[in-house]
Regions:
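Charged phosphotransfer/docking patches of two-component systems
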Residues: 513-515
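Extended, highly charged
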Residues: 1-275, 280-290, 294-505, 511, ...
Length: 520
């Protein structure tokens, strides 16, 4: 799948796309239509008549597991699994066995970058860019403006020349400038930091659209320094075509729908945000670098892809789960002592992850926990709460199973760790300041220490209005507001009605346990 328009054609042929010819506004209306359709499990949407825009826009392209499968197929998964298998067996592989994997070598020859003389993205150029004519969307009422929500931000390290392709939200400030939300632990932000120390502007190419694999590569949790375009090539099964920018220094992706090219000057910031984010609340307004746009290129008949984020599950939920499953074999190769990893899209991914380990000596579990939280590059180091357990036969995607396994084994005095004064995801506002906060580690390994109660029976604890079971051993309890009774938690902990339950959540509405997204 080498470009967006081929993918859109496939979706239409498969009955997975609806064209909307009626005039619509990019100011909240497209986003609301998108939200209603995705919540109903509906099709991808192609908005052909957007008020004030010269281009159509497509949303919900990846809003179901089936459409994700149509975008990428089985090849990437099969290729990576075979590659990892060879890497694991390499020391003992006989020449005959190695020869049996020759198909993989042929596939490997297709991986890489290829420079071409011309490309569709150069078909049209706007010498005097007017970003107001592009269908950037405003998705939530309190958003600070209109955003590129599927941006592919390409930069090169000012010293090494190594490239980075990342997805960092982009806000339109005016007709020729954009805000670049380089949050913590982002490769493009590291490039800008180096350029700024040299008092130099950083060249930047913002691509919109292109092969679907570009989007997946931009969000993949790759270690710093691993080139995203190589993953793109691997996913699509052919070399990524690049073309020289006749008016700039960076290469352009030949099959992109749009290339918005400019530079980010040093020591320049403008307010960016607020933005309704994937955690389900607004990230606030902060100062961020500014992209000064020099040129806008686009292919003929260009389509502007977009998405809408918010409380999960949204479109990024399906992409996030796919990339986790795809990268699982590589994770086991890089971290062989960790048998499995899963981050929970219901929480926005960074908030909650669990890993499966085998503890060979007391407290070894903490070594594995620090291995995850200390991951060099990638996004695992931003994990807020990590559950470490030895439930190898569990379905990691079912957090109830994981939590029951842990609660049967945990001693909270020795197995719950809260580490303060750490760097946090920029979008996490639970700490004392931006990028600051605490992390938690919960360990449940070894033989069971207790039998977990399954159903709550008996009178409600004093002051409680409702009790619901989330899983064996875990209750949600509706209690008084903290401002009304700040000591209620201490009172509840001494109530014999809950003495057999190892974990109780004191909440406003205990019925949230029925919905994993609301509860987690």
């Amino acid at each position: 799948m080498n470009n967006l328009q081929t993918f859109i054609g496939l979706l239409e042929a498969e009955g997975e796309l609806v064209r909307i010819a009626a005039p619509v506004s990019s100011d909240l209306e497209i986003a609301e239509i998108h939200r209603r359709v995705i919540s109903a499990g509906g099709p991808a949407l192609l908005f052909e008549n957007i008020k004030g825009s010269d281009f159509p826009a497509a949303t919900n392209l990846f809003g179901t597991s089936r459409r994700v499968d149509l975008a990428f197929g089985k090849r990437p998964d099969q290729f990576l699994k075979e590659l990892v298998k060879i890497a694991e067996e390499l020391p003992t592989l006989s020449p005959r066995k190695l020869w049996s994997h020759r198909r993989l070598a042929r596939e490997g020859l297709k991986v890489g970058l290829r420079t071409v003389r011309d490309g569709p993205v150069l078909a049209c150029r706007q010498p005097s860019p007017n970003l107001e004519r592009l269908p950037l969307i405003k998705t939530w009422p309190e958003d600070g403006g209109h955003f590129v929500t599927l941006p592919l931000v390409y930069t090169e390290h000012p010293i090494t020349g190594q490239h980075n392709l990342g997805m960092y939200r982009i806000q339109r400030h005016d007709t020729c400038t954009l805000g670049v939300h380089w949050q913590i632990q982002k490769g493009g932000g590291f490039h800008y930091h180096v350029a700024e120390k040299q008092d130099n502007a950083l060249p930047l190419a913002l691509f919109v659209g292109g092969p679907p694999s570009l989007i997946l590569s931009a969000i993949a949790p790759l270690p710093e320094g691993v080139p995203e375009l190589i993953l793109t090539s691997l996913l699509q099964g052919s070399k990524v075509k690049r073309v020289r920018d006749p008016n700039g220094s960076l290469p352009l992706l030949a099959e992109a729908e749009f290339a918005i090219v400019g530079h980010v000057p040093p020591h320049t910031r403008k307010p960016e945000g607020p933005f309704g984010d994937h955690y389900g609340y607004y990230s606030l307004r902060h100062d961020y670098p500014v992209l000064e746009v020099n040129n806008v290129y686009h292919r003929r008949g260009a389509i502007f892809p977009a998405t809408v984020v918010g409380k999960p599950p949204q479109e990024d939920f399906f992409l996030g789960n796919y990339i986790q499953e795809l990268m699982a074999p590589l994770s086991r190769l890089v971290m062989p002592s960790i048998k499995a990893i899963w981050s929970y899209g219901e929480t926005g991914y960074h908030c909650l992850s669990s890993i499966v380990i085998e503890e060979r000596y007391p407290r070894e579990a903490m070594k594995f926990a620090f291995r995850i939280l200390g991951e060099d590059g990638g996004q695992l180091s931003l994990t807020k709460f990590l559950v470490v357990h030895d439930g190898e036969g569990l379905n990691l995607k079912d957090f109830r199973q994981v939590l029951e396994h842990v609660l049967a084994r945990i001693q909270f005095e020795t197995d719950l760790f809260v580490i303060a004064n750490l760097a946090m995801d920029t979008l996490d506002y639970t700490g004392p300041a931006v990028n600051e906060g605490s992390k938690g580690i919960l360990v449940g390994v070894g033989p069971p220490k207790r039998n977990l109660p399954v159903d709550f029976a008996g009178p409600l604890p004093k002051g409680a209005s409702d009790v619901q079971t989330y899983c064996a051993g875990c209750l949600a309890l509706s209690g008084p507001d903290y401002n009304r009774d700040p000591s209620y938690g201490q009172t509840l902990a001494c109530d014999p009605a809950i003495s057999k339950w190892p974990l109780i959540f004191l909440v406003d509405d205990a019925s949230i346990v029925a919905n994993n997204v609301r509860f987690l």
